[in-house]
Structure formats: C-alpha cells, structure tokens
C-alpha cells in the first residue's frame, strides 16, 4: 500500500568489503552506543558503501581499483561487442602483444586509452561516460594476463562468505532484535527498511510500522552490521558489530533528511537509490519518447539504470541503440534475423535523440523525486538476500527442490548452482562448453526424483544433472535459429515426463523427449511462438503467452489429453503476456510487458488484464508471475523496486519494496509448502537470490 501523497510532476537515474571494516557513511553522533556498537561521523558525501546499487552503477562489484575493477568495467562496457563468440569486432585478448591498433597507431597504454575515449565506427566514445581512472583500470586489465573475461569464467564475489563464515540463516518471521526508528524532523517513520547483515554476508531486512517500530526474526546470536537499506531521502545509517541474542532491544535509530522537501539532489548517491521507473519518471521527455524506450529497451535484458547512468554523445548513443536492438538473441552475437524495417529505424532515431538530450555530455538533471514509501500491510514482510559465489552472475531462474534448496541459472555464463537456504552455502556446477557457443543457462526445473533439467538456449541443448553424483548429460534440441540465437529456453514438464516448449518461428507448441531431444508431437498455433509455456497443476493443460516484446496480444491453451489448441488474443490492446504459471483453479497467469497481470481464463476462454497500483506504462511493466496455493499472484516490477501480490478474489493489490532499487525478476518460484506463502526470485541486476516472506 502506498501513502496517499501527490507525486509532484516533473517534465517528464581495495576489494569490495573484504572485511566489515571499510569506512562508510554512519550515524552523525559519534561515540559508542549502549549495545556496544561503534559509531563514527557521517561524511559530507552521503555514500553508503553497502548500497549494492551504488557499487553496480560505479563498477565496484569486484574491486575498488586496478585490474580487477577493470575486469568489472570490461564486462559491462566491452564484452558485448568484443567477446570471442562474435565476428563483428576484434577480440582483445593479447592486445598488447599486437604491433598496432586497427587505426594503425602502435599499441601502448596511451594509445589504447585514447582509442577508448574517442571511439570509432561501430564503437561509442567513452570519454564522457568513463572517467580517466575508469579508463586506466580498463587499460590495466587489457594489459594483464586476466583478459578477457568470458562466460567460461567469472570473478569471485567478495561478499559471498557462507563457506568461510559458517552461520545459520533465519527462517522465521518474529522473535528477534527489535527497536524504533525516529525521523529527526518529525516526518513519518513508516516504511523504513532496517537491515542486519550476518557474518556470512546474508542480509535480512524488515520494515517499520507507522510508529517506527520494527522486529527481526530470531537469528543466530552474534555480531551483525545494522544499517538502513536504501536510505534515499535520509543520510546513511550504519553501525558495526551490533550484538544480537534473541529479542535484543536495540538503541533508537534517529534519521536525518538530506533535504527539507521531497526534491532530492541529483547526486550519484541519490540516483543510485532510485528505481529505473523512478528515474524514467523524473527525466524530461514526451510520452512518445518514453514509450519508444519502453518498447525497445525495457524487455528485461538489463535495468533502466544500466542505460541512465551513462552520458554519451548522439553518435555514440546511435551506435549503442543499433547494436542493442538489431542483433540476434540475448548475447547480441548474430546478425539480424531479418532486415530492419523503416519504422524500426525511425524508432531508433527517436530513442537516440531523446537519450542524447537527457543523457548527453552536457545534460544536467534537476531535483529528483522518489515515489512515497509504502504503508500498512506492505511493511509486514521479511526479505532475505543471499550472495552467490560469482560476481557479474546474470542470475536468471530459480526453482526449489524437495530438500530445501534453491537451484539457479546464469544467463550469460556456464555457472549454475544449488543454494542451501539454511546456511547460505552454494554448491556450484559448470555446464560443459559447446565450441563456438556463448555459455549460458535459462530455465531450471527439478523433477520429483530430484533430477535437475536446465535449458541452454545459446547452445541449443537440454542439460540433465543428477545431484546425487554430479553426473551431467547434455541432449541437443533442434532449433530454427543458429547457435547464439535462442533455441529452447522456457519449458515445462508433463506428468508423463515429456518436455513442452514453444520456440521462435515454429508456430507450435512442441512435445520433446528429454532422453533424445527429439520432437515427438507438434501442436500448431496461430502465432510464431509463445515466449513461455506452462503445464497446469493437474497436468491436463498447457498454456502459452505472447511472443517476446511489447507488441504481442496472444495466449494459447492446449488440452494435452485431446491435442486441441485454443488461440486467444486481446485485440488491439497488446497484453504482451511473458512468463507465468497456473493457479489452483486452472487459469493461467502471465506477467504483461505493458504493465498488467494477464489472465487466461480457462472457463470463460478469454484474456483479462489487471492493472497494478502506481504509474502505468511506460513506467511499469512485468515479466514473470506465479500464483501461490491460494490463487494469489506474485510478480516483480521489471524496472521498479516493488514486488506485487494480487488477490483475484478481492481485487486487492499489496506491494512489497525490495532493499535495493530493483525487483528485476526474470522468473518467480513460489514455495507452496509454507504458510504463509514464501516467494523466491533471482535479482538479475544484483546477482543475488531473494526470499520474500509475508506475515500474512
């Protein structure tokens, strides 16, 4: 629930904490509190080193400077065009062993840095978006023996400590440390996120009620970091070595505002705490311009922040827009699968000119306005964030097994794994490599016998893993596209053990034998494909949504028993259902890329859409949703910070704010064995696994 505050309209963004000792923003009052925690003064710049979004925006996910930070920047800025799987640009491994650059000048650090800053045909100029120190770190990385990172290997995540610091992860809702938050100016303290970070790096966040009170679940006794997560309009607050033992009463937290009004300074620290939809809402521009961005750049491959943190000239934005929008598949490796239309080129031009205006070298942001904090039932929730062993992970799907583990995939690397939710310890696996294919996994499914099925979309394979012995078997699955364009990605499994999937251009749902990868039956449909396909809980039906993107309006319902396919559409309204699942009543639900929950009503044989609270498209869009055992539907805002819960019986929406300004969920898994419901997702922007536990 949101507080009813009017949104002020605008004309419309050393190794990471190898120990807990890095100096960051802390409470203003110096000294030692009654619970033994050390306080130090808050610096003038309101930066919180524990804010993951800030570290992501500033390429601090792996290290503070040097070769390792250069690797971090390379992954975000260079890898997409210079990876070894593509042919359009030179690979950069061994660059300093070459006599000359493609411009003909000698290869040395000065000339390489100059080329990065200037750019060239097909390459943006980085001089206005990377600092001199950023470029120096990239050059040091290119000069090192580590270059160049591919999906075959990723750097270690310095925040993953569950193997070295053994610590039990809480699983309850109440009974732990508690206290009160007060705002010095007298403003409401409701909806403030209070967080404890355990020695193993696992973060637990709870939320204040209208009196400013909060309560953690009972946690293992010991020393924790206490902080305010995503403080945004407040000065950062952090206390180290806070001793927790059962229902410890914590000292009152007093927060100070960074501004006297809702207008926040447009500093990097503030913008890093805004969600993508908040930044887009703040930026100048027409609805046409913002809708053009939404239709082309909001499909889930990255956050809005990954766009808006940059400053490029118009030529460079044009290079990037062309590269991002007209390559085949997620890795952007293959040439366009079909010629680019005149209308698409016109949209490219519109997006390029708008980005150059609002995110050009000379553009200056006005004051930034954040959406109001949530109230009421929205704050009755516990959110837990688990670290994974690799940085730059691109964590995609999650799925629970019968032993309390969560399996996850990695979209652009060979690494996938199993998270022990009781300890935070991850068992990591590496998918076999396919020559010439970008490694990466997409959907994961755990069968009743414990065997794990994982799709490898870029190499066109189905991976089968036996967790008991680690044995892996890969089965090729034919696809209508070349490798490095997506083959089978999303799939589900029928009661008799066959895989059902729909691949691009096939105009069908396909029944596939997982032992051989061969299609055994084809069910024609009227559209090229359904991005997702899910099997009903009774195993009698398969449902698919629309094609990928914002322009689809279709949904399909297959009676598996008879082979009859029902094709539906939402007319001129583009419902754009992406990923989803069945509720207990036989209806399929999908996340709509144009901002709605999309229901395929099986009995009425029609598509329905439900609009969440908050601003509509182009600001709000969904990607993946999943019903729970009660029929309530859960899904994350693709470019927001809220996770949504919808009760179709009552029409009630409940929003839950995440501790980072992302709810970047490519897939949702609902644990139907718990009461209340427990929801899991992999945050694609932070590379963490997130657990949501509502109190009701």
Segments from the language model and where they lie:
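Electrostatic cytochrome c docking/interface patches
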Residues: 35-73, 164-174, 201, 208, ...
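A short, solvent-exposed loop/turn motif at the edges and junctions
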Residues: 199-201, 223, 227-242
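C-terminal capping alpha-helices of c-type cytochrome domains
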Residues: 127-159, 327-330, 335-367, 404-406, ...
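Gly/Gly-Pro-rich "capping" loops immediately C-terminal to redox-active cysteine motifs
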Residues: 64-71, 80-115, 302-329, 430-431
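The canonical Cys-X-X-Cys-His
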Residues: 70-85, 123, 138, 142, ...
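Short, acidic Ser/Thr/Gly-rich low-complexity loop/linker segments typical of extracellular
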Residues: 197-213, 217
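Blade-level signature of beta-propeller repeat domains, shared across WD40, Kelch, NHL, RCC1
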Residues: 663-696
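Structural motif
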Residues: 167-190
